[in-house]
Each structure stands twice: as C-alpha cells, then as structure tokens.
C-alpha cells in the first residue's frame, strides 16, 4: 500500500466533528484527540466559564475548536445547537460524538421519578434526539460516524445504579439499530463502553473503597486514562475502521472478561 494511501486511512484531517460535553474528562480528551489529528470541532457545555477557558487553551495550541453554551439535556437547546453546527459546517457533519452523560448512584428502591427523568433526558434522550437531528448532516457528508459514549454498566451488572446502567444499555442497542437502519445512508454507529476512568466525575462519585474493589478486578490493575478512551473513539471514526459498525467496545483494563480464575497481583 502506497504511503499516501496508508496515511489517508489513518487520517481525520479536516473532518467536521460535534462533541457534546467536551470540557471535562473523556469529552475533553476526545476534543484534543481529534484536534490533534487535524479535525475541525464544535463542542458544547453548560458552564460558560469552563467552556471559554478550554477554548482559550485550545486556541493557543493551534486547535480548530469552537464552542456553544448549551444544556444538551433540553430539547430546544439541542435543536439550536444543531442549527449552529449546520450553519458552521455548511449543512454537513462527518462525526457526532454523543458524550454527554451524568450519574446519580443509588439503590434501585431509593430512586425517585425525578431521578429517572434526569437520567433518561441526560443520557439517552439527548443522544437519541441529537442523532435524529444530525442524520441529514451526516448523510450529506457521504461517510458519517456516530459514537455513543456508553459504559461497562450497560454490558454487565455494576454497582453504579440501575437507571444509569439501563440508559447505557439502551445506547448500546441504539448503536446496533442505527448501524443497520442508516448503513444505506453511509452512516456507521458504534458505542464505546469504558470502565471507571480517572476523571473528575469518577473522583466525585466513587469512594476509595469502591475504587479499590474495581482496581482489584481489573487484570491491568489500574484505572484507565481519558486518552486511552479517546484514542479508540478516534480510530472508530477513521477510514481504517470503515468495516466496523454496530459494535459496543469495552475499554476496561480487562474488567468485563475477568471471571473467577484471575487473582489480582499483590
């Protein structure tokens, strides 16, 4: 394979990308990953100060990143966001990264109706609706990609809350459905399911005992880093991954494949 062709297979240069929740944790790493490959990115966040701080840093790095203040859990704001993206990118979008997510970890019997609505609107409805809104833009690009940021909690039972887990499982199924339904439109869809990653969200939600137990179950014996997730997200959107669609790929240090035979190293 010629060098130029090889390089093109592993390129995201000039690709247009929308990343929701791109100012923190995995979302922040995804923005920087794609920007490092030469993509043109628009991201959104609720906190205007944090967004502007990130945009300023990215500008200094020479990244092509713009941003909107937006609560993507709200339908009118999602519609406004997609109008902005459509105008900015000339009615086309190459890549949609549905990264927005939130968690309230409780026993099932302690969840309220408001907790249920919160998780559904933030984790599931936002991704579902944004995918609907993005469809004509992705189709117009001729080679669209959708990534749903899921969780291993949507693959196996995890003590992080049944509603959160249900929304992540739904995202995995949504990736499968859209992969089949929209394949004829030139759109691929995949889900990426991390385990506990070293992010501010993980620090805020999980106590030390929980973290210790999780690490003890991981054959690699540590938490993952955001960049170890963003690298997979970038790969899935490259021409090199053109035959991968409808998949849920775990990024978990081996956690989901660890049965009873493995004993963590002391």
Swiss-Prot record:
Q: Which CDD domains match?
A: TR_SDR_c (cd05329)
Query: What InterPro entries does the record point to?
Result: NAD(P)-bd_dom_sf, Sc_DH/Rdtase_CS, SDR_fam, TR
- Gene3D superfamilies xrefs: NAD(P)-binding Rossmann-like Domain
Q: Which Pfam families match?
A: adh_short_C2
User: Which sites are catalytic?
Assistant: 164 (proton acceptor)
Which interval of the chain is the signal sequence? none
Q: What residues does substrate bind to?
A: 151
EC numbers listed for it are 1.1.1.-
Q: Does the keyword Transport apply?
A: no
Q: What are the entry keywords?
A: NADP, Oxidoreductase
- Entry's Gene Ontology molecular function annotations: oxidoreductase activity
Binding positions for NADP(+)? 18-42
Per the record, the similarity remark reads:
Belongs to the short-chain dehydrogenases/reductases (SDR) family. SDR65C subfamily.
- What is the protein name stated in its UniProt record? Tropinone reductase homolog At1g07440
The major lineage groups are: Eukaryota, Viridiplantae, Streptophyta, Embryophyta, Tracheophyta
């Amino acid at each position: 394979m010629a060098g130029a062709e090889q390089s093109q297979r592993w390129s995201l240069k000039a690709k247009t990308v929308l990343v929701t929740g791109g100012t923190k944790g995995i979302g922040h790493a995804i923005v920087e990953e794609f920007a490092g490959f030469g993509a043109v990115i628009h991201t959104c966040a609720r906190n205007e100060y944090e967004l502007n701080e990130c945009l300023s840093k990215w500008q200094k790095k020479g990244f092509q990143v713009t941003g909107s203040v937006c609560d993507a859990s709200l339908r009118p704001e999602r519609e406004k966001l997609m109008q902005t993206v459509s105008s900015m990118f000339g009615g086309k979008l190459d890549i949609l990264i549905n990264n927005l997510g939130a968690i309230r970890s409780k026993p099932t019997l302690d969840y309220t109706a408001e907790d249920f609505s919160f998780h559904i609107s933030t984790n599931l409805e936002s991704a579902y609706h944004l995918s609907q809104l993005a469809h004509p833009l992705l189709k117009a690009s001729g080679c669209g990609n959708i990534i749903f940021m899921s969780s291993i909690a949507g693959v196996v039972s995890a003590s992080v809350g049944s509603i959160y887990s249900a929304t992540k499982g739904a995202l995995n199924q949504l990736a499968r459905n859209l992969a089949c339904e929209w394949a004829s439109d030139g759109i691929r869809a995949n889900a990426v399911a991390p385990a506990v990653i070293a992010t501010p969200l993980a620090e805020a939600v999980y106590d030390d005992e929980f973290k210790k137990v999780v690490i003890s179950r991981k054959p690699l014996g540590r938490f993952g880093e955001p960049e170890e997730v963003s690298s997979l997200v970038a790969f899935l959107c490259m021409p090199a991954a053109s035959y991968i669609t409808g998949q849920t790929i775990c990024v978990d240090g081996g956690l989901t494949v660890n049965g009873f035979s493995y004993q963590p190293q002391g």
